[in-house]
Swiss-Prot record:
It is found in: Nucleus. Required for pre-mRNA splicing as component of the activated spliceosome. Component of the U5 small nuclear ribonucleoprotein (snRNP) complex and the U4/U6-U5 tri-snRNP complex, building blocks of the spliceosome. As a component of the minor spliceosome, involved in the splicing of U12-type introns in pre-mRNAs. GO terms for cellular component: cytosol; nuclear speck; U2-type catalytic step 2 spliceosome; U4/U6 x U5 tri-snRNP complex. WD repeats lie at residues 65-104, 108-147, 150-190, 192-231, 234-273, 284-323, 326-358. GO terms for biological process: mRNA processing; RNA splicing. Transmembrane segments: none annotated. Component of the pre-catalytic and catalytic spliceosome complexes. Component of the postcatalytic spliceosome P complex. Part of the U5 snRNP complex. Interacts with PRPF8. Component of the U4/U6-U5 tri-snRNP complex composed of the U4, U6 and U5 snRNAs and at least PRPF3, PRPF4, PRPF6, PRPF8, PRPF31, SNRNP200, TXNL4A, WDR57, SNRNP40, DDX23, CD2BP2, PPIH, SNU13, EFTUD2, SART1 and USP39. Component of the minor spliceosome, which splices U12-type introns. This is U5 small nuclear ribonucleoprotein 40 kDa protein. The modification Asymmetric dimethylarginine is found at residue 21. The gene is Snrnp40. InterPro entries: G-protein_beta_WD-40_rep, U5_snRNP_Component, WD40/YVTN_repeat-like_dom_sf, WD40_repeat_CS, WD40_repeat_dom_sf, WD40_rpt. Pfam families: WD40.
């Protein structure tokens, strides 16, 4: 009787079987770089799924080529290429569309690359390294045009100014936050912090540097007055990632207390600047610097996590929209595409994934 019922099944309206999400993701690994549609049989499962919403060759693309943990990844502002770097000291440049070819490798650092950033027009790429330097690269030619030396220990973070003269701020294990003008050899300003600095960013107008580190506090330094303006407290463990929203009003922070927070960094904001707390992602004993990022329109945020999942939250409701599997190691950075609904993740499993999100 049961067998007969089973045979009748197909006459019912066809409802897609809910497959475990990890099967979907890992199935698509076959549809990664170099796999044409005819080879990617597991990927066909995804093709038959939800309608496509980006120009990626497949809904999920795997980028493999690094020889060590991948710590950072960023899309070029024009959205057609991306950069990744990590423990192997190399910066790899990739095409976003087509087969996602690794079309260039930038060599020059003698230590792990901890963070990468393009400047606003994408003409320059900045990289912070454990070799105590920050390198400035011409993103067209791949040539290193400048090396910023002055830190006495690992440089954990760098961030280029969004507008005005090309300034860059850096944070290091030597406990300092430095401001550089790339036309000059030495740092223009140095702010002394008691403990290691793990993450830095500018405010929107680039007259303040915001830093986070192992003292759990987020500090805002005024470049005109050359002093600490205010401190934002709330995290109960080291702050590992900072990201400013695209319109510059809000700051996102990721910390080892397993929370991601949003802070109001507008001038004259109320004294209690923490406006939202997000939970779900985790940090662990590996103590990797897990970063965080905003979607271009500010409606979503994403953060690295040590549990091998990519977390994406809705900014308004604070709900986890996506918990994406597929990686086999800590996810150290997640980046949103500037124009399309694509998310990029860099992991300790030496791989990067690009995937569509609705």
């Amino acid at each position: 009787m049961i067998e007969q019922q089973k045979r009748k099944g197909p006459e019912l309206p066809l409802v897609p079987v809910k497959r475990p999400r990890h099967e979907l993701l890992l199935g698509a690994a076959g549809a990664g770089p170099g796999a044409g549609p005819q080879q990617a049989t597991p990927g066909a499962l995804l093709q038959a799924g939800p309608p496509r919403c980006s120009s990626l060759q497949a809904p999920i693309m795997l980028l493999s080529g690094h020889e060590g943990e991948v710590y950072c990844c960023k899309f070029h502002p024009n959205g057609s290429t991306l950069a990744s770097a990590g423990f192997d000291r190399l910066i790899l440049l990739w095409n976003v569309y087509g087969d996602c070819d690794n079309y260039a490798t930038l060599k020059g650092h003698s230590g792990a690359v901890m963070e990468l950033h393009y400047n606003t027009d994408g003409s320059m790429l900045f990289s912070a390294s454990t070799d105590k330097t920050v390198a400035v690269w011409d993103s067209e030619t791949g040539e290193r045009v400048k090396r910023l030396k002055g830190h006495t220990s690992f440089v954990n973070s760098c961030y280029p100014a969004r507008r005005g003269p090309q300034l860059v701020c850096t944070g290091s294990d030597d406990g300092t936050v430095k401001l550089w003008d790339i036309r000059k050899k030495a740092a223009v300003q140095t702010f002394q912090n008691t403990y290691q600095v793990l993450a830095v960013t500018f405010n929107d107008t680039s007259d303040q540097i915001i830093s986070g580190g192992i003292d759990n506090d987020i500090k805002v330094w005024d470049l005109r007055q050359n002093k600490l303006t205010y401190t934002m407290r709330g995290h109960a463990d080291s702050v590992t990632g900072l990201s400013l929203s695209s319109e510059g009003s809000y700051l996102l922070s990721n910390a080892m207390d397993n929370t991601v927070r949003v802070w109001d960094v507008r001038p004259f904001a109320p004294k209690e600047r923490c406006v939202k707390i997000f939970q779900g992602n985790v940090h662990n004993f590996e103590k990797n610097l897990l970063r965080c990022s905003w979607s271009p329109d500010g409606s979503k945020i994403a953060a690295g996590s040590a549990d091998r999942f990519v977390y994406v939250w809705d900014t308004t409701s604070r709900r986890v929209l996506y918990k994406l599997p597929g990686h086999a190691g800590s996810i150290n950075e997640v980046a949103f595409h500037p124009d399309e609904p694509i998310i990029l993740s860099a992991s300790s499993d030496k791989r990067l994934y690009m995937g569509e999100i609705q």
